[in-house]
Amino acid sequence: MARLKITQIKSKVSEKQYQRDTLRSLGLKRIGDVTVREDTAQNRGYVRTVAHLVKVEEID
């Protein structure tokens, strides 16, 4: 199964609480943090919620 490399590129300071919670669920705490997750529907939904704050790459 493919994996997603998710990098936080923008601050969460002025974002809504549910978007902050989504970043925390992904394991991202500050700008520059990187996490690798399985490519599942749940993780895709998380990424879609905070797409303006993160950069996503598919890795094998």
From Swiss-Prot:
Any one Gene Ontology cellular component term annotated for this protein: large ribosomal subunit
GO biological process, one term: translation
Entries under InterPro entries matching the protein: Ribo_uL30_ferredoxin-like_sf, Ribosomal_uL30_bac-type, Ribosomal_uL30_ferredoxin-like
Organism field: Leifsonia xyli subsp. xyli (strain CTCB07)
Protein name, entry field: Large ribosomal subunit protein uL30
UniProt GO molecular function: structural constituent of ribosome
Family as reported in the entry's similarity comment: Belongs to the universal ribosomal protein uL30 family.
Cystine pairs: none
Assigned keywords, A-Z: Ribonucleoprotein, Ribosomal protein
Alphabetical list of Pfam families matching this protein: Ribosomal_L30
Subunit structure as annotated in this protein's UniProt entry: Part of the 50S ribosomal subunit.
